[in-house]
Regions:
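A secondary-structure boundary/capping signal
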Residues: 21, 127-129, 221, 292, ...
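Noncatalytic nucleic-acid binding interfaces
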Residues: 473
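Residue-level signal for inorganic ion chemistry
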Residues: 51, 111, 130, 172, ...
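Left-handed beta-helix
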Residues: 1-15, 220-430, 435-453, 459-461, ...
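Conserved core of the sugar-phosphate nucleotidyltransferase
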Residues: 135-263, 281
């Protein structure tokens, strides 16, 4: 089925508010994508992350009047990194923070509640943060066409004409072409949504021409979505409304209430609403699919990334220091170490500092099973990289033993860590470069290069960078438990949870634990 598109008339342009859903974890792209640093924040294809590219391509949507705000829905732990990647890329962002992942239907419901409270019911262009679009003009044109139908009360999804028999995508059965005033704008009724098919069924869909890939991009008026979700998934609507009403604004962030949101069921836009619209004609809401011919790809797996990247004459994709010998149709990426492949075909090799994936290219959908096993075994590689981004900078876990850990910590100029303490570990800090401002108990002092200090178990402390260049320190932790959840925060400028009262002064206990020569050394260093 080849759609015929006519120019969209100019009067009465819909006003479109872009909504980016950035709550995914990207487990099938492990070990590069991890829970604390998911795929939408990683430079997977180029020197730009998918989230940054998504925000940038929203500038100048054709056939619609773009509002002056971009709405981003993301997880609490990704808020600072996500905000940094959209600032300056598109309109000014307003960021809704989900305390827990609940799939796309609750995320869109929160966005619709937020916009109707602050606006006059705009048309929402809702899209995931992890798609690749090669033809931005065609994408913007499709959004503008879909917005025309949405303005009149439909919920519109963008469908992609399949290029191959893909088993990793959902499909939409395309119904009759829309007629009437907007009949020439490429819209079709939706027959049904189909889950990811097996290979034989995907081949049938490809050759029939009546089944398009489900892009996961939706266009709807905020009020229309709220009407649909209230009728078809009332528990989602009720929980999201309660969570939004009890939420707290903090500069460009809006933090929904965690306790209320905890009661929200997890469901997708497709399952909660789109698949059920035809069974509820009393709602008066039509589901429409508009074609998207813009070089769309959902980069959810390593084979999907291999598919769209430039290849050598043997069909190989290399990123990083890679050597191929008698190897074909493979994807190899190294974050540092040299990787050599000999006599291989259809393999994926991903090297990181603390984990290496080697997989058959046709089995990469099963990478998520590895991540689940790592979580069961409580391995840190399931959720964090060795190098971990924080609002104040980053740290790199250089070495880890049974009762010790060595970290390289970099604090950006003007940034500070939270005022905190640990119940199970002591810390030694050595300044490599820059100047450190240290709070330790009742003391505050500066440390310069080659100077050091000691933080005892249970001692309240803070590290700051008051200078103009990055502060780099080596931290040596020792204790019987070294997990990142052994942090009690008393003050934090990044909105992380804090306790309200400081503990009793630990001076006496510290003196009992600390050798006299270490105390003397600390006085000398200060």
């Amino acid at each position: 089925m080849t759609p015929t598109l006519l120019p969209v008339p100019e009067p009465d342009l819909p006003r479109v508010l872009p909504v980016i859903l950035a709550g995914g974890s990207g487990t099938r792209l492990w070990p590069l994508s991890r829970e604390c640093h998911p795929k939408q924040l990683i430079e997977l294809i180029s020197n730009e992350s998918p989230l940054s590219a998504t925000a940038r391509r929203l500038n100048g949507i054709s056939n619609a009047s773009l509002g002056d705000t971009l709405l981003l829905v993301c997880g609490e732990q990704h808020r600072v990194m996500s905000a940094a990647q959209v600032v300056g890329r598109a309109a000014a962002p307003r960021i809704l923070l989900e305390p827990a992942a609940r799939n796309t239907a609750p995320a869109l419901t929160l966005a619709a509640l937020d916009t109707t409270a602050l606006d006059e019911d705009p048309v929402l262009a809702v899209m995931p943060a992890d798609h690749i679009i090669s033809d931005v003009a065609a994408f913007q044109d499709a959004i503008g066409r879909a917005a025309r139908y949405a303005q009149e009360g439909a919920i519109v999804t963008l469908g992609v004409l399949p290029r191959r028999a893909e088993t990793g995508y959902g499909y939409i059965q395309v119904g009759a072409q829309r007629t009437g005033r907007l009949g020439g704008q490429g819209g079709y009724s939706i027959g049904r949504f189909v889950e990811k098919p097996d290979v034989a069924l995907a081949e049938r869909y490809l050759h029939s021409g009546d089944y398009w890939w489900n892009s996961g991009i939706f266009v709807t008026r905020a009020s229309v979505w709220l009407k649909a979700i209230r009728a078809l998934a009332p528990a989602i609507h009720a929980a999201c409304e309660a969570a939004w009403r009890a939420g707290v604004a903090e500069e460009s962030f809006f933090r929904v209430d965690a306790a209320a949101f905890d009661a929200c069921p997890s469901d997708s836009i497709d399952y909660a609403v789109m698949e059920r619209l035809t069974d509820h004609p009393e709602l008066g809401i039509e589901g429409i699919v508009v074609p998207l011919a813009a070089g769309w790809s959902d980069i959810g797996t390593w084979d999907a990334i291999w598919e769209i990247m430039p290849k050598d004459d043997q069909g190989n994709v290399a990123r990083g220091p890679i050597v191929f010998e008698d190897t074909q149709d493979s994807f190899v990426r190294s974050e540092g170490r040299l990787v050599a492949c000999v006599g291989m075909k259809d393999v994926v090799v991903i090297e990181t500092a603390d984990a290496v994936l080697v997989a058959n290219k046709h089995d990469v959908q099963r990478v998520k099973n590895i991540v689940e096993r790592l979580k069961i075994d409580r391995r840190p590689q399931a959720s964090e990289h060795r190098k971990v981004q924080r609002p104040w900078g980053h740290y790199d876990s250089i070495d880890l033993g049974e009762r010790f850990q060595v970290k390289r910590i970099v604090v950006e100029p003007g940034k500070q860590l939270s005022l905190q303490m640990h119940y199970h570990r002591a810390e030694h800090w050595i300044v490599v470069s820059g100047t450190a401002k240290v709070t330790r108990g009742d003391e505050t002092f500066l440390l310069s290069e080659n100077e050091s200090t000691y933080i005892a178990v249970g001692e309240v402390h803070r590290l700051e960078n008051p200078g103009k260049i990055p502060l780099e320190i080596i931290e040596v932790q020792s204790g019987n438990y070294l997990g990142e959840d052994d942090i009690v925060r008393f003050d934090d400028q990044y909105g992380r949870a804090v306790v309200q009262t400081l503990p009793p002064k630990p001076a006496t206990a510290r003196a009992a634990r600390e050798p006299r020569d270490e105390a003397a050394e600390r006085e000398t260093v200060r």
